[in-house]
Amino acid sequence: MSLFLDTARIEVKAGKGGDGAVAFRREKYVPDGGPAGGDGGKGGSVIFKVDEGMSTLMDFRYNRIFRGKPGEKGMNKGMHGRGAEDLIVHVPQGTTVKDNETGDVLVDLIEKDQEFAVAKGGRGGRGNIRFATPRNPAPEVAENGEPGEDKILLLELRVLADVGLVGFPSVGKSTLLSVVSNARPKIGAYHFTTITPNIGMVQVGYGDSFVMADMPGLIEGAHSGAGLGIQFLRHIERTRVLLHVLDMSELEGRDPYEDYKTINDELESYNLRLMERPQIIVANKMDMPEAAERLAEFKEKLAADLGPDKEMPEIFEVSGLTKTGLQGLLARTSELLAQTPEFLLYDEDELADETAYYGFEEEEKPFKVSRDDDGGWRLSGDKIERLFIMTNFDHDESVMKFARQMRAMGVDETLRSMGAKDGDYVRIQKFEFEFVD
């Protein structure tokens, strides 16, 4: 878990499907009742649901494992087991769910009451009523329930704010937020006072409002993890308008123009799309005696750097301490929000390319063969292991069915071509049997 409670690593395991039953009708006046074993019920899935009342991932610090319930077993008289209820896990709005191993984004949960099954429950095993044929009207075959999906997930929470305040530490972002909104951030005259994003609702005129977030201070190298690092930049991705706060006083001994360039370089290095957002320069602490002169120097350097062909960005002179210049800043910010659509976190073209690429990948082989240290053979792979788990070895016909499935998959032929001989041990998970050529 990160310092800012915006990431969490958890395990989700869906419920196993219920086992199918091997049973026969044994009723008076029904001498040839036939099979009557019902199917097992579906295992419970683990479903994430957006909860607008949550604002952090704090709950996942203490509860990291979420398990769905198994489905009921099949019963006699063809009765199927009851499916298990899904496990609903509430997450904050704005949570991004990633596969911890691959880093792939599974879902971006941004809509109210949005749901997504992060781990699907296993299907119930079929009872012997499903395997009756004219050649075998009374089969002693049933399947075990399919195991539920088991995943390690990485959760990331980005602040859902319309406007983000960015700038170096101690330039007055927290003070500014406190006087224009209902937020009450911690304020202090030292670096990194803000270590988590503070959010406030800003009212503009009658009925207009927007959410503003005081993003923790950035430093040079933040995109590669320097200082409090990349954690800060993650929070900026969802904002639509950036207010770049600069300290025009001499209290910190900083150069506003160098600060301005450094912060924008960090934003661009982390994600090029951050620079597509409208950005207003907020010249703060203009109540200080030397502020006007430093602002003039800043404008001169910026104009020289941009050249005659580029338009100067908007600059608003304010003082968070004396509350001057804020109404004009907020009104202009509200106008920009009305003109600016939401930004996608992930490029749709890139996702489309990935989808096309994966669509043409060769189908994964149903099994792999390797050698153990003692010379035995080991079979592995999702498909063959799933068949193994779903085979009920208490019944000879089920074992024979599993042997036929392996033969159809080409297991016997592959082992033979690799040099397996009569009497060699072949293992699947913890099960061991002898190879017969």
From Swiss-Prot:
The cellular component terms of Gene Ontology attached to this UniProt record, alphabetical and capped at eight, are: cytoplasm
Some GO term, biological process aspect, for this entry: which one? ribosome biogenesis
What molecular functions are annotated in GO for this chain? GTP binding; GTPase activity; magnesium ion binding
Residues involved in Mg(2+) binding: S174, T194
Which cofactors go with this protein? Answer: Mg(2+)
Binding residues annotated for GTP, in chain numbering: 167-174, 192-196, 214-217, 284-287, 319-321
HAMAP family for this protein: GTPase_Obg (MF_01454)
* Function summary: An essential GTPase which binds GTP, GDP and possibly (p)ppGpp with moderate affinity, with high nucleotide exchange rates and a fairly low GTP hydrolysis rate. Plays a role in control of the cell cycle, stress response, ribosome biogenesis and in those bacteria that undergo differentiation, in morphogenesis control.
Q: Could you tell me what this protein is called? A: GTPase Obg
Organism listed in the record: Lactococcus lactis subsp. lactis (strain IL1403)
